[in-house]
Each structure stands twice: as C-alpha cells, then as structure tokens.
C-alpha cells in the first residue's frame, strides 16, 4: 500500500489555525478519485444542504443543489460502513458513510472495527475501478469523532492497514499499484496524522523500492508544488 500524508484536504485547500482557508495544492485531476465522508441522511435525502467537507465536495461535483444522489449511490449505501464509487462526468467520488461516534460511547476496539469495515468498503470499490490514485480523508473526523477525536489519527492508520490486509490478493494488488494520499484539511492536525502514519509511509517507501523503480515520481497535484 503506497500512502503519503498530505497537508491539505481532498480538494487541495487547507485551513490554518486562524480559520483562514487557502489553496495549497492542485485540485483532483481525471483518473484521481476523492473520498466523500457522506452522511447517511444526505445519501437518502439528497446532497442539498450538506455542510463541512461533504458540502465542499458536492459543490465541486456540481451536485450541491440536486434533490437526490444518483440511483446507484442510493442503492449501494443503505447503512453506515458502506461505500460507492460514482462518476460525475470525469470526476470520480468515493462516497463512504462512516460511523458516528458523537452520539454514543464506543471503545477504541469497537471504533477500530467499525472504521476498518468502512475503509474496507471504500478500498474494495476503489480496487475495482483501476484508477491511478485516491485522495482519502479521515472517516468519522470532525464532529463525528466525539470523545474519540484524540485517538482518531492512530485509529485511522490502524483501520486502513487492517482493511487493506483483509482485501483479497487481487484487490490488494490493484490498490498497491495506485497512490493513496491521506489528506488532512486542518493544518494543526497534520503533524498528528503524519506521526500516526509514520510506519505506513516507511512501508510504502520500502514497497516502492522493492518494485525496482526507485521512488514514485511525485506530481504537483500531490504536493501543491507549482500551484
């Protein structure tokens, strides 16, 4: 699994501690999917009125005023921990409904299990698409993290690894050939996620080296250089 932690959100913007939002990286390009932390209510009732990261994504997809999601999305996602990849023209969006930890007590082990299921659903969808890259973000972040917010970076890293390890070999291969970026919108949170994913990013570098290709060339849309 080739993954890096990026200091910007899936759309290439970042929020400073002051609350100011600025563009720091190129937006998603064709062949690159982005993850949408969808709310089940909005999947059922339509994207109109969604806020936060999902609202920004729906505006980018030009569906923020639509009354409903496409039928394949509504049919595939009927409960939390489910996912569906959908194309909007040339833009690919991986809708995922994660667990909501804000309204209930949940142990770290229980949270890890639920997050693993959510990331597993997302990775299976992505593996079947054969796309070149995926911009992820922490599922169940923000207000949905509840009392588990301090543990979310380590839970996210552990869940993503467990989800990948549980994939069939063919899906592991497909995911490994793509580039995964864990995108952190809040600048104050980036260091915590970089630390949590340190082992994963080291493994990614070792995996790339094992292919005999050297380091994978880093593109401007990945880092923000040249934006």
PLM region spans:
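Macrodomain-like recognition of ADP-ribose-binding/processing modules
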Residues: 1-227
């Amino acid at each position: 699994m080739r993954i890096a932690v990026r200091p910007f959100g899936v759309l290439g913007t970042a929020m400073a501690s002051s609350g100011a939002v600025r563009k720091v990286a190129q937006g998603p390009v064709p062949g690159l999917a982005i993850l949408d932390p969808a709310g089940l209510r909005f999947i059922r009732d339509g994207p109109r009125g969604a806020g936060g990261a999902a609202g920004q994504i729906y505006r980018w997809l030009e569906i923020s005023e639509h009354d409903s999601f496409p039928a394949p999305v509504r049919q595939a996602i009927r409960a939390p921990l489910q996912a569906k990849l959908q194309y909007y023209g040339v833009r690919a969006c991986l809708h995922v409904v994660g667990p909501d930890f804000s309204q209930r007590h949940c142990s770290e082990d229980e949270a890890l299990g639920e997050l693993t299921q959510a990331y597993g659903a997302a990775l299976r969808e992505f593996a079947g698409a054969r796309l070149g890259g995926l911009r992820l973000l922490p599922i169940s972040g923000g207000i949905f993290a509840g009392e588990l917010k301090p543990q979310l970076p380590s839970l996210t890293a552990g869940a993503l690894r467990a989800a990948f390890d549980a994939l069939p070999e063919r899906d592991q291969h497909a995911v490994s050939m793509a580039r995964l970026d864990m995108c952190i919108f809040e600048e104050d949170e980036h260091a915590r996620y970089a630390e949590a994913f340190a082992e994963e990013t080291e493994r990614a570098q070792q995996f790339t080296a094992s292919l005999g290709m050297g380091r994978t060339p880093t593109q401007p849309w990945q880092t923000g250089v040249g934006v």
